[in-house]
From Swiss-Prot:
It is found in: Cytoplasm. This is NAD kinase. Pfam families: NAD_kinase, NAD_kinase_C. The gene is nadK. Involved in the regulation of the intracellular balance of NAD and NADP, and is a key enzyme in the biosynthesis of NADP. Catalyzes specifically the phosphorylation on 2'-hydroxyl of the adenosine moiety of NAD to yield NADP. It comes from the Archaea. GO terms for molecular function: ATP binding; metal ion binding; NAD+ kinase activity. Its EC number is 2.7.1.23.
Amino acid sequence: MKFGIVARRDKEAALKLAYRVYDFLKVSGYEVYVDTDTYKYLPEFHEEDVLPLEDFDVDFIIVIGGDGTILRVEHKTKKEIPLLGINMGTLGFLTEVEPHEAFFALSKLIEGDYHIDERIKLRTYLNGENVVPDALNEVAILTGIPGKIIHLRYYIDEGLADEIRADGLIVSTPTGSTGYAMSAGGPFVDPRLDVIVIAPLAPIALSSRPMIVPSYTKIDVRNLAVTREIILAIDGQFYTYLEPETEITIRLSPRKTKFVRFTNEVYPKYTMKIKRKF
């Protein structure tokens, strides 16, 4: 069994726990690799065990950090490697255990006492080409000039859904429904559902409301303000400016994100975290 370890780089406690996990797994006889960025911030790992995250070819990745760290890992890994998240962030919607549970969780993982939770992702096409990362949380189409609204028209399976003047449009998975989409007025969606949330961001018209559509839906977005650039943001990890005439299409990705889970609990785990968030 082979493991990869990635830690939140700006938190000393996360880096120290990463080394303890690394040492525990090495002493237990497993192959263990550490990503290059973690090594830069804590160069105590054996150099021969250091690899770029993109080159990880392991059975599991232990992610020690918050949701942002998990999203960074998910964007950089090329394979669908199951992730075990140890929470060193604020709320940790995507993580599975707290730091004091880390070694108990590792023991259960080694013993095979776990299950895999698969989450859908979204794929974005720009003028018909997929040149940007898949989204685990959301695809956000945002105004390129703060304080200036954008004029968007979006279609669902070729049919006109709405035309909005707003700060942007968020297209979210159930996983991302507790993030940016919820701040835009979207609902909490049970992560076991295969649906997509579409949420206008601060629209002028109060009739432009969030909606939920099936995951197999094709969503096309057009920028009607032909002189104004827009920003495409994916999971808060990837950003790019788009020319005004860019045709944006969002569909279900063939890839999924896999998480190691030790229980099937959804409630009250998520609802309590939402209460703490707001």
